[in-house]
Amino acid sequence: MRLNFEELDYQQTALGELILRRRHALEMDGREVFEVKLNDEYLMSSLFHVGEVALTDLGLAALTGEGWDVVIGGLGLGYTAAAALKYDQVARLIVVEALAPVIDWHQRELVPNGRLLSEDARCRYYQGDFFALARGDGFDPGDPGRLFD
């Protein structure tokens, strides 16, 4: 028997309670929906990710050539990263995520894009503060100062 609602993970973080849950929306013929909550606020839902894909397409459309090095701030449910990896020109993708449990969800394939991102050799995750890294030595601890497209 399929559960209509399931809490997949709960973690206490420095920002508060982080919850990953899955539900089947009966009003949409049982469509599977993933949701992320931080405390009492909804951060993201698999129902609404068109904006993430559109922003990725807009950003990458400005690039030319091959061998793009791309960095994304925030992993979430992985829709931005998955959209970037659809471009064959992306040679390397670094995704910086502030909350370690979010990276763990992808590595454990608890979220829809987990397997896709974790198995793509072009994609790496780093746990950290995107904005602090941008102000510091860069996004790749193994290659300080490296520039990205």
Regions found by a protein language model. Give the residues of each.
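A generic short-segment signal for beta-strand/edge and adjacent turn/coil regions
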Residues: 1-7, 38-42, 62-64, 91-96
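N-terminal auxiliary segments of SAM/dcSAM-dependent transferases
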Residues: 1-33
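Sparse, context-dependent recognition of short Cys/His-centered cofactor- or disulfide-binding micro-motifs
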Residues: 3-5, 28, 40, 108-111
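Short, conserved beta-strand segments within well-ordered enzyme catalytic domains
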Residues: 19, 35-37, 71-72
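Pocket-edge structural micro-motifs
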Residues: 21-24, 38-40, 47
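A short, structured beta-strand/loop element
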Residues: 29-44
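The AdoMet/dcAdoMet-binding core of the Class I SAM-like
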Residues: 49-149
